[in-house]
């Protein structure tokens, strides 16, 4: 723990470059990592602590189908919000103790405004019309962004999912 405490307040920057072989290279066991996406999300809470807006910026290469990428980002954000705030799937000896009806999926009335931001570079990759793809990456940054929003809102650091002492956890106890 002391090592982690020493890192408090520092910023870290990292660039990931995986060696890759040229597409179609005649080499044994070629490495074909051709592209990587990037995503970052910012969550805005209202005065009650309810998520009112999510800004989701994604570098997914060239946007080929805007409707599909919008849907993928919105679905990923909602899935990440569920993990962060409302969904609980307790297990006992590996057996689920909840049913889908009691899982805590978001209600349609609880869906915040989601702003999808497409980051497209002038220089496109020489594959598949410059597209990188969008998928699970839309879910990954959401829960940390929700935790960061709550930490900024009330100063409490929550370390487990679903997050406790939120607008949503308090509402669950009332319903």
Where would I find each of the regions flagged by the language model?
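C-terminal catalytic domains of large/alpha subunits in multi-subunit enzymes
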Residues: 1-175
């Amino acid at each position: 723990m002391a090592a982690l405490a020493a890192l408090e307040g520092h910023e870290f920057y990292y660039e990931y470059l995986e060696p890759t072989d040229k597409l179609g290279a005649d080499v044994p066991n070629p490495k074909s990592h051709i592209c990587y996406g990037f995503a970052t999300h910012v969550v805005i809470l209202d005065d009650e602590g309810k998520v009112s807006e999510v800004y989701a910026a994604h570098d997914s290469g060239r946007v080929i189908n805007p409707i599909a990428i919008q849907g993928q980002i919105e679905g990923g954000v909602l899935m990440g919000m569920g993990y962060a705030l409302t969904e609980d799937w307790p297990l006992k000896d590996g057996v689920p103790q909840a049913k889908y009806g009691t899982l805590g999926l978001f209600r349609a009335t609880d869906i915040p405004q989601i702003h999808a931001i497409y980051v497209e570079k002038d220089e496109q990759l020489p594959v598949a019309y410059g597209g990188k793809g969008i998928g699970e990456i839309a879910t990954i940054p959401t829960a940390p962004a929700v935790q960061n929003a709550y930490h900024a809102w009330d100063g409490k650091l929550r370390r487990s999912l679903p997050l406790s002492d939120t607008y949503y956890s308090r509402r669950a106890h009332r319903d």
